Amino acid sequence: MQLCRFNDDRLGLIRGDEVIDVTAALKVLPPCSYPLPKHDLLIAHLDTVRAEIEQLIQGAPLRHALTDVLLLSPVANPGKVVAAPVNYAKHLAEARDDQAIHHQNQIGEIQRVGLFLKASSSVVGASEGLRIARPDRRNDHEIELVAVIGKAGRNIPAAQALEHVAGYCVGLDMTVRGPEERSMRKSPDGYTVLGPWLTTADEVADVGTLDLLIEVNGEVRQRANTRDLIIGVAGLIEFASSFYTLQPGDILMTGTPEGVSQVFPGDRMVAQISGLGRMTVDIDD
Ligand code: MN
């Protein structure tokens, strides 16, 4: 199933080039009150919502053309955004070779430097666009495969890790280059783009063989395959959960391949991963 959040927080089911409005399925979510849970309510109850959607589509819910809707982040309230710093060998070489990328920061192997966190306030959907936070700096796109955690866990072994994934989407880990810590440079508003929608894990046969592609203004900048990840999705979940409990709705950004490059106000990025969809993201003027 491919589910989007669109327009005014509507829930949509993707069918070809249409979005079926299945917002009514959200009525199965339990009421929640202050203090809010540490997980995303929809992702935590995804199985129940999916069953309700199957019922709903027997009727004749409203349909929209995909081109007519505004796509929001498929996860509304991620508790945390966990990210892999340098997780493709060719990007490690590129980052070490280019002073404009490394800024005298030591670029270590992921096994040694570990993961980092991005502010959840940086998350947006494809249609929300983003504004360059520091126009005085180099700002880069990083296309990444994103796994959305579906089931809570701590110390999850790699062999069971994929059972904790609700689904996958395309991610852009936007980055201000410079000497500061990654968590600061990668957390401005809009610097985590998720979309175009959530593809549930049962629809992804092998997450280790997906093609990634991003074009900026029609020019290919990054083209890679997840088979070249240094630590794959299961290993990243094992690694992350050895430090903290993963919750439903937590976002795992798996790292970017080689080809990162600068973007400017007015640029249009088109990012796609095989089976997960293609999203167009504009950088505000
Ligand atoms: Mn990244």
Where are these regions (language model features)?
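Catalytic-pocket segment enriched in acidic/His residues
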Residues: N7, D47-E54, P61-L70, P74, ...
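A generic local secondary-structure boundary/capping motif
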Residues: M1, L71-S73, H103-Q106, L130-N139, ...
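C-terminal structural segment of proteins
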Residues: R5-D8, L13-I14, G125, N139-G153
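Short coil/turn connectors at secondary-structure junctions
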Residues: N77-G79, I110-V113, A119, P135-D136, ...
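A gly/proline- and charged-residue-enriched helix-loop-helix capping module
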Residues: Q104-S127
